[in-house]
Curated annotation (Swiss-Prot):
One of its GO terms (molecular function) is ATP binding. The chain crosses the membrane at residues 10-30. The keyword RNA-binding does not apply. It is found in: Cell inner membrane. Pfam families: KdpC. One of its GO terms (cellular component) is plasma membrane. Belongs to the KdpC family. Part of the high-affinity ATP-driven potassium transport (or Kdp) system, which catalyzes the hydrolysis of ATP coupled with the electrogenic transport of potassium into the cytoplasm. This subunit acts as a catalytic chaperone that increases the ATP-binding affinity of the ATP-hydrolyzing subunit KdpB by the formation of a transient KdpB/KdpC/ATP ternary complex. The keyword Transport applies. It is a single-pass membrane protein. Keywords: ATP-binding, Cell inner membrane, Cell membrane, Ion transport, Membrane, Nucleotide-binding, Potassium, Potassium transport, Transmembrane, Transmembrane helix, Transport. This is Potassium-transporting ATPase KdpC subunit.
């Protein structure tokens, strides 16, 4: 019996060492050497401090900023740990809302968001990504159309010409990955940083 167990145990130890130790360390080392910024989380620094990541969205609510997609992430309720409260872009709780297309709660949330956006920009169709959450709840990007939809509000709040803001959006559009994958997109954090830089000039 020991003769049968020995090869199995040797194989278990060898595969554990290779797949659990050697492979992860090799991949981490190669990623750190070839892509140091990405391996560290694609962090964005401003004035010597980290202000975010280009991979994780943030909750921008000010009138003078571009807003991202709605986020369905939540956190434990401080008053009652058995319940949760909304916590937009909570990276520790990445997930969609799990609300199906027949959910009354989802319909109410979308109706409320839609009404607010239509009041902000009457007569213009609302881009779908401004009322729908992503699968992760942490999407850092919006469509160019969603960014352009917000231009009039930001122009009013910052007293800037709309044409200048449209040019700003156009300069931040990232195309499809490898020309094939995904859709054109705008990173909301990067766009807001460029917007702040514009205001300083």
């Amino acid at each position: 019996m020991l003769n049968q167990l020995r090869p199995a145990l040797v194989l278990l130890v060898a595969l554990t060492a290779v797949t659990g130790l050697a492979y992860p360390l090799a991949v981490t080392g190669i990623a750190g050497a070839l892509f140091p910024a990405k391996a560290a989380g694609s962090l964005i620094e401003r004035d010597g401090r980290i202000i975010g990541s280009s991979l994780i969205g943030q909750s921008f609510t000010g009138e003078g900023y571009f807003h991202g997609r709605p986020s369905a992430t939540n956190a434990a309720d401080p008053a009652d740990a058995s319940k949760t409260v909304p916590a937009p872009y909570n990276a520790a709780s990445s997930a969609g809302s799990n609300l199906g297309p027949t959910s009354a709660a989802l319909a109410e949330r979308v109706k409320g968001d839609l009404a607010a956006l239509k009041a902000e920009n009457p007569g213009r169709p609302v881009p779908v990504d401004l009322v729908t959450t992503s699968g992760s709840g942490l999407d850092p990007d919006i469509s160019p159309e969603a960014a352009l939809f917000q231009v009039p509000r930001i122009a009013r709040a910052r007293n800037l010409p709309e044409a200048r803001l449209r040019d700003l959006v156009a300069g931040q559009v990232q195309g499809r990955t490898l020309g094939l994958l995904g859709e054109p997109r705008v990173n909301v954090l990067a766009l807001n940083l460029v917007l702040d830089d514009l205001a300083k000039r």
